[in-house]
Amino acid sequence: MDAYLKDQFDFTGVKAALLVEQSILVILRDNKPDIPWPNTWELPGGGREGQETPLECLQREVWEELGLTLKEGSIIWSKIYPSMLDKDRSAVFVVGRISQEQYREIRFGDEGQEFKRMPVEDFIKAEGVIPQLQERFKDYLVGKEIDN
């Protein structure tokens, strides 16, 4: 895990591609016209609260959205990007793994319409997924190929 995930610095939030075998856990955003990307598939995560570190922000968001305790050892890749909502600020994107058992234990919160597993190949090509998240996940795949 990258050390900066435990550091306090100025960032807007964290999004996580949580892999369950060869699939990614995705959440269908609420269909409300006053939110960015309504009725679009996205990844768990959200905005920073107070002086949270990226890891603390991610763990809180995953707990609130999915009822899962995400251990830092689950994180396999991360990178800092420009925020999707404020290009002058930073956001963090992580890739992590959860087990089939953890997936079955999800208690879906009150943000979003539904969650599901989407095959990796579908996620990177699908219409109706936030494009920036697709691009960030592709960066992980490219980096993984280079490392192998």
What are these regions (language model features)?
Residues 1-15:
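Acidic, metal-coordinating catalytic segment for phosphate/diphosphate chemistry
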Residues 8, 16-17, 32-33, 83-84, ...:
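Short secondary-structure boundary/capping segments
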Residues 11, 19, 38-43, 87-91:
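Short connector loops at helix/strand junctions that flank enzyme active sites
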Residues 22, 79-104, 116-122, 136-144:
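Active-site-adjacent beta-strand/loop module that shapes the phosphate/pyrophosphate-binding cleft
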Residues 23-64:
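Conserved Nudix-box catalytic region and its N-terminal flanking loop in Nudix hydrolases
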Residues 34, 38, 108-148:
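Nudix hydrolase/Nudix homology domain
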Residues 69-79:
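A short coil-to-beta-strand element that immediately follows conserved catalytic motifs
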